[in-house]
Amino acid sequence: MKILLIGPPGSGKGSVSELLTKNNTLKHVSTGNLFRAILKEDSELARKIKEINVSGGKLVPDEITNQVAKSAIDELIKNEQSFILDGYPRTINQALALEQYCNLDYIFYLDIDHQELMKRLTGRWMCPKCAGIYNIHFKKPQVHGLCDNDQATLYQRADDHADAVSIRLDEYDKLTLPLIKHYETNPRFIKINANQPIEDVYKNINNYLKQNK
């Protein structure tokens, strides 16, 4: 089973993917996580990504993104492992590249208002150890400023600051909205109301998967 979650930053793709992988035999493929892992390396690819200023809200070029995503997806397909794509593809060129080697079974579009996105993104804090995500508005840690899992001090990513969020949403409107139009004629395309709580978004998707196996 090959699932795509598509939607703007802050729509809940990561959180929903986490819930789906926890309760199903699915692997979570997040380009954000893949890039963060690469940035820890001393490699030419890491240096290229750093030069792009991802932390300032800029998107990595399609050529690099396709290379990184294909490497991860090819391995899963080779092992016949079901997976969820989160954050890829996000442009028409990326979608066309993906279609060359991967047929998606479900395309879930997380539809959400911009006002709700700003609230979610600027209120988001992250654990440096386990990558757990919290939000000061609706997913607070048990102890202020500390991760529930490992008690590490939470931090706010540079791309979750207000200025960077505005850039990310502008980039999304310009590059990813055309992708929605590309997919919405596909019979596997399902629109989900992502303004509701993450748990409800997850339940809607999980129920759909159960009913349409």
UniProtKB/Swiss-Prot annotation:
Enzyme class: transferase
One GO CC annotation: cytoplasm
Residues annotated for AMP binding in this entry: 31, 36, 58-60, 87-90, 94, 157, 168
Cellular location(s): Cytoplasm
Recorded GO MF terms: adenylate kinase activity; ATP binding; zinc ion binding
Pathway: Purine metabolism; AMP biosynthesis via salvage pathway; AMP from ADP: step 1/1
Residue positions binding ATP: 10-15, 124, 133-134, 196
Protein name, per record: Adenylate kinase
Record organism: Ureaplasma parvum serovar 3 (strain ATCC 700970)
Gene: adk
